[in-house]
C-alpha cells in the first residue's frame, strides 16, 4: 500500500470544529442558555450598572415571523447585548400588539366573507383573542430561535386588563393636560373592513393610466380677449392621467 498523502501534510490540529453545523449546534446552544438562565445571570451581574431600557415596539400577533421580524429583533438584540457587555443593566421585556385590523383580517380569511358578515361581535372578539394567543406562542418560539435574550415568560400583551387599564389612565392624563381635542382631519377608510386606516396601512399598486390633453374653451367676457390681443376663441390646456 502507498503512503497516505494526509500524513505528509501540515494540517491544522484543533478541537475547534471545522464546520459550524448550525442546524444541530444552534438549538443546543440556545437550550444551554435557557437551562443556565443566561438572561437572568446577565441582569444579576449588571444589577448595579446604569439602566439601559429598550422599549420594544410590539409586532402584531397575526402569523409566523418573517424577515422583517428577524431584522427588527436581531438589531435590538445587538444593541441590548452590546450595552450589557459594557456593564449596563439591560432588562428587556418583549411585547405583542393583540388588537387591530391585521388580526381581524386573518380571522376573516379563515371564516370567509359570509360567516364574517353574520358573526356576532362577542364571538368575533373571542376568535381574534384566540388567534392572537396562538401566534404569540408561535412568534415567541421563533424569536427564541433567533437567539434573542429577553424575559420571554413575562411579555406584555395589549389585550390584558392591566395593560388596557394603563392606556385608559394615560389617556385621562393626556386629556387633563389639554392634549386631547376635537378637530377635523381627512382619514383613509376601508369600505370592506369598515374601519379607519393608518397611512402606513395604505398600499399603492402600480397602474397604467391614459395620458390625456384636454382643452377647455373660455367664456368670452366683453373686452377681455380684445385687450389681450386674442382674435376669436381662447382655451385653457390641461394634462391629466385621471380622467
Where are these regions (language model features)?
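N-terminal, positively charged nucleic-acid-binding surface of large information/translation enzymes
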Residues: 2-243
Amino acid at each position: 500500500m502507498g503512503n497516505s498523502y494526509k500524513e505528509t501534510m501540515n494540517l491544522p490540529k484543533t478541537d475547534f470544529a471545522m464546520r459550524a453545523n448550525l442546524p444541530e449546534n444552534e438549538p443546543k446552544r440556545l437550550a444551554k442558555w435557557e437551562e443556565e438562565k443566561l438572561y437572568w445571570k446577565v441582569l444579576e451581574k449588571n444589577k448595579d450598572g446604569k439602566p439601559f431600557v429598550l422599549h420594544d415596539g410590539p409586532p402584531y400577533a397575526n402569523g409566523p415571523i418573517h424577515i422583517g421580524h428577524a431584522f427588527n429583533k436581531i438589531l435590538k438584540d445587538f444593541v441590548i447585548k452590546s450595552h450589557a457587555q459594557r456593564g449596563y443593566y439591560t432588562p428587556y421585556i418583549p411585547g405583542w400588539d393583540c388588537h387591530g385590523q391585521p388580526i381581524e383580517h386573518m380571522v376573516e380569511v379563515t371564516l370567509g366573507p359570509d360567516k364574517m358578515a353574520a358573526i356576532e361581535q362577542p364571538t368575533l372578539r373571542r376568535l381574534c383573542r384566540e388567534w392572537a394567543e396562538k401566534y404569540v406562542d408561535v412568534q415567541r418560539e421563533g424569536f427564541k430561535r433567533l437567539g434573542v435574550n429577553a424575559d420571554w415568560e413575562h411579555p406584555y400583551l395589549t389585550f390584558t386588563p392591566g395593560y388596557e387599564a394603563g392606556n385608559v389612565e394615560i389617556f385621562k392624563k393626556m386629556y387633563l393636560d389639554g392634549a386631547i381635542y376635537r378637530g377635523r382631519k381627512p382619514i383613509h377608510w376601508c369600505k370592506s373592513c369598515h374601519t379607519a386606516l393608518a397611512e402606513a396601512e395604505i398600499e399603492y399598486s402600480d397602474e397604467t393610466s391614459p395620458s390625456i390633453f384636454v382643452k377647455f374653451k373660455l367664456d368670452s367676457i366683453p373686452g377681455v380677449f380684445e385687450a389681450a390681443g386674442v382674435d376669436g376663441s381662447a382655451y385653457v390646456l390641461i394634462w391629466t392621467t385621471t380622467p
